[in-house]
A protein has these predicted regions:
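ATP/NTP phosphate-donor binding region
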Residues: 1-36, 40, 79-94, 105-115
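Redox-cofactor binding/interface segments in oxidoreductases and associated redox assembly factors
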Residues: 39, 47, 153
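N-terminal glycine-rich "phosphate-gripper" loop used for MgATP/nucleotide binding
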Residues: 39-43, 51-54
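Short glycine/serine/threonine-rich phosphate/pyrophosphate-binding segments
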Residues: 44-50, 160-165
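Short, acidic/small-residue loops that bind anionic groups at enzyme active sites
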Residues: 57-75
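Catalytic core of DAGKc-family lipid kinases
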Residues: 69-149
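ATP/nucleoside-binding phosphotransfer catalytic cores, i.e., glycine-rich phosphate-binding loops
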Residues: 123, 139-142, 190-264
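Gly/Ser/Thr-rich active-site loops/lids in small-molecule metabolic enzymes
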Residues: 141-189
């Protein structure tokens, strides 16, 4: 980094754990004061920092190296860390623009919480809750009352996360779309729907939601308990996340590797 005239800034608690005598910033303050973020961890670490970057409005790229398990988003391996960092600092690395989602929870016409997420917004019942009725609209058009354990509104980037696990489609991350996927629907014909990016999805619990166990979660990082007739509004965010790509693999190579396609 010295050769590139770059001053590294470490996250405060991480530097303390490693007993590093370096410049540090709190995690929430990092995006506003740096030109690039290097993440070492799994997809959860990336999602946590992606939300912070989006909330601050910082227009900075992220280089994510997989120190975790599966690592769909943190696709750069440890062996590729230094070559990838060199390309990023030289300005020759390839960047993806990953679309994000904006989620607003409204109660009695008042905003309870607003979040920006990269993967998905999930509405789900508690372990001891009955099956829910979720009234779903897209814009001004009513879609259906879904009887299900929950519902996922995912971005194309999030299509390979929880959405994929419950039978949703894989959507290329550069496609401009939203994905609406029911979780364990009572009716088998309630299938996932791919929507235009300009859509606003509105989800309202109307039955099975009066036991204080229904929650909406944002990228699995943060959750809010829902009441009956709360409305969860999900739409495409105005900004996107700049994510450095692995230097030696394209998106389909990542799918083959992570999903073990064509392996016996």
């Amino acid at each position: 980094m010295t050769a590139h005239n770059v001053t590294p800034v470490f996250e405060t608690s991480t530097a303390a754990l490693a007993s590093l005598d370096v410049k540090t910033l709190d995690r929430d303050d990092l995006p506003s004061d740096v030109d690039m973020v290097l993440v070492l961890g799994g997809d959860g670490t990336l999602l946590s920092m992606a939300g912070r970057i989006a909330e601050t409005g910082a227009n900075i790229p992220m280089l994510a190296v997989n120190f975790g398990g599966l690592g769909f988003l943190t696709e750069i391996t440890l062996d590729e860390l230094y070559p990838s960092l060199e390309l990023a600092l030289n300005g020759t690395a390839k960047l993806d623009q990953r679309h994000m989602l904006r989620a607003v929870v409204k109660r009695n016409k008042q905003t309870v919480v607003e979040r920006l997420v990269l993967n998905e917004v999930t509405i789900m019942r508690g372990a001891s809750s009955p099956i829910m009725d979720l009234a779903v609209s897209v814009g001004s058009q009513f879609v259906a009352n879904f009887k299900a354990d929950g519902l996922i509104v995912a971005s194309p980037t999030g299509s390979t996360a929880y959405n994929l696990a419950v039978g949703g489609p894989i959507v290329h991350p550069l496609v401009e779309a939203l994905i609406l996927t029911p979780i364990a629907p009572h009716t088998l014909t309630n299938r996932p729907i791919v929507l235009p990016k300009a859509s606003e999805v509105r989800v309202q619990p109307v039955f099975g939601c009066d036991n204080d166990e229904v929650v909406t979660t944002f990228d699995g990082q943060f959750g809010v308990k829902l009441q009956c007739d709360d409305i969860v509004c999900v739409s495409a965010a105005s900004g996107s996340l700049k994510l450095f790509r692995a230097p030696t693999r394209n998106y389909f190579a990542v799918l083959r590797e992570k999903l073990k396609w064509a392996e016996r």
